[in-house]
Amino acid sequence: MADLTPMMRQYLEIKEQNKDSILFFRLGDFYEMFNEDAKLAARELDLVLTTRDRGKSAEEQTPMCGIPYHSSDGYIARLIAKGYKVAICEQTEDPALAKGLVKRDIIRVVTPGTVIDSACLDDRRGNFLCGVFLDEQNAGVAFCDMSTGHTHVTAFSGADRAEHLCNELARFTPAEAVLSAGAYADEELKVLLADRLSCRVERGDARFDLKAAEKAVLAQYGEDACAALPRNNPAAALALGGLLSYLHETQKSDLSYISDLEYYEQGRFMELDLSARRNLELTETIRGKEKRGSLLWVLDKTKTAMGARCLRSWLERPLREVAAITRRSNAVGALVNDTMAREELVLALSGISDMERLIGRIVYGTAGGRDLVSLRNSIEQLAAVREQLAHFTTGRLGELSQELDPLADIAARIAETIVDEPPFSVREGGFIRKGFNAEVDRLHDILSGGKGLLASIETKEKERTGIRTLKIGYNKVFGYYIEVSNSFKDQVPDTYIRKQTLVNGERYITQELKDLEQEILTAGERDNALEYELFSALRDEICAGAERIQKTAAAVAELDTLASLAVVAVKNNYCCPVVDDSGVIEIHDGRHPVVERVLKDALFVPNDTYMGEKENRVAIITGPNMAGKSTYMRQVALITLMAQIGSFVPARAARIGVVDRIFTRIGASDDLAGGQSTFMVEMSEVAEILRQATAHSLLILDEIGRGTSTFDGMSIARAVLEFCADRKRLGAKTLFATHYHELTELEGTLAGVKNYNIAIKKRGEDLVFLRKIIPGGADRSYGIEVAKLAGLPKEVVSRAKKILEELEAGGSYIPPREEREQVSLDAIGEAEVLDALRRAQPDTMSPIEAMQLLYDLKKKLPN
């Protein structure tokens, strides 16, 4: 260290305290990075890597790269998006006033979960940091969106605490997680976070101390919030304390904006695991990971970023309380029924910016003049929103009308202080409105050339000296001067200092002119400082009203979400469902909300659904591939979920008994990294469903048992069906799609089981899917016909038909257990061939693969 330059010594000392971060080290107008940070940043940001003197010897060089400080947001955003932490090291004193080395310190550490800059955020979804506590008895998790100030916390206990914890993580999809020692030791939890949720994981053992946590929660949220946390489960406070500790470590600033805390019980929201969210494509599609094609894509007609985040939150957290659901659906209904008010309200909402995140940036001190003007414009637009809400005096819309604070005082202060189109930076002046501050006006006059001041001096000097040809000018040699023609040079006062003789006169300077010149030279610096001082004072005034703005923003967000649901309901001809605790799901002419929009001009065939507490509790659905079984089952699940967020639903009429969870087992794939086959993945998921489901759950099970031999698969499928149907063991409402037609015999044998199939029509050799769900079981799967539709070569289809005819003629029927003593090896071979045909995916096969399959099947047949 002794051989290092003072600046490099300072850098290394600061870097030592921030080893896990890329250090942005402020040097003049640049943020510089050195050593390994420089190499990493150069690679990730496409920067030129150079070197700098490290020590007193010229041979000692260190890698270096840099970026302009005023354009750093974009670079930081790129690093954060890749999961890095960035420590911002600023000069904490004026370099012009520094004695020796300029003092520097870390002002904040930017991480994926603590970022607040708009360049780093998706304005239509929340950005959550979470604290996770897990031990042998309890689990707790807290989520905080720093950009809006909202915090949510919950806790669990018992044997299934880890499963509930994972479901909450899947619900919020945090950008970053701080884990306690117990949580960090849970490998499955880390895999979920890092691999499946793309979440940055931070180990934070020391941050999870109960006494420190309780103290931090009290200081941050107050006594009422502390009282709301469960006393019998400290995991909630521990998770919240770990989160707050990390926030204070990284932000190094006032966090008073984070004041909105919600503790929620496990039973308040419908629970969905990651598999259900993925299979139902709530917010993104499975294949493209895109919004288009998801349920959110259909429902999102919001006009504000706040409304978009609120709608997403509702989709992620469907309600279970009937009264709360009804309040929402009644509000949607009121907007549906008042066309003019709805359309005018939507128009008014479209003029409102992201007030939640604007006030966040103002409080954190990162807002500029443009942010304040945007806030002012949004506040002024509230009057139009309130005008439309005046039509609704009762229900949730009436309450929202009262929750909209006009905020006129804040808008007026911004309007009188800040110009309508301020510059980007608040450090370079030019944004304080004329007439607000006399000194700023005077400095602006000086900066514009001091024309007013020069004119007043010129007039004054003419009157004082009687020299009517006197005029003030400027040149680069000696600055401002007074020019007097030869005919008046005898009247020049003694206070004038001659600087230049001309053919027709003389040029002079005065002390007053020199003072003015000095003012002009320093006016820019003084104006920048004064304007920033005035801006800071205004910012502090706005911060004092932050809670008012937060509450109004929340009301706007909810209103925008309700309006969006109303717009979609009218456009797509949805109905208002009756939501109750009956346990019945009854849907008349239900439609898949996404598929019908994707089809556009094509007609979507609606279907009825009835599932009761006793009758029709389990529906066995048979029919060929591509007929629409999976679409129908997803449709029922999505309509149920939509009803429980308070939305209208795509149906002629609907009655939805509240469900506590929706589980899905649809499709499968090998988990190669985990060393699990398709069948193993399927069985693991089914096991979790049967372990976690309750009698109030809705189960969507597709092709259970297809990944193994026919007998094994059919046995497993039947056992699962029996378990689901048995009210003593589970008794959950279940939609069960299968190609095992033998299972249709369970209707009449198991209470609550009902058979359905997808209607089809044969036209000669062709198959027509009618997409209609009708009572009864299908007699066959039409796999070869589907293979033909998928484009399998004619010779392969013909050969498959012949093989199937031979198998059927060969008596491959497996009699019931009571009719047989032992299954023949011939029957087993034939059954395996049939099973392989059922599992074949012709739409993904090449002709060569199809031929190879046929050869393999032929080998399995008995001689």
Regions from the language model: what does each represent?
Residues 368-371, 842-863:
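Short, amphipathic C-terminal "tail helix"
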Residues 410, 417-418, 424, 480-496:
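Cytosolic, long alpha-helical scaffolding segments
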Residues 35-38, 233, 303-304, 314, ...:
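ATPase nucleotide-binding head domains, primarily ABC-like/P-loop NTPase cores
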Residues 364, 368, 378-381, 399, ...:
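Charged, surface-exposed helical/loop "interaction arms" that form contiguous linear patches used
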Residues 89, 112-121, 254, 392-396, ...:
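Active-site phosphate-binding and catalytic loops of NTP-dependent enzymes
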Residues 1-337, 343, 350-363, 367-459, ...:
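Charged catalytic and DNA/RNA-contacting regions of genome-maintenance
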Residues 502, 506-540:
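Extended, charged coiled-coil "arm/hinge" scaffolds of SMC/Rad50-like chromosome-maintenance ATPases
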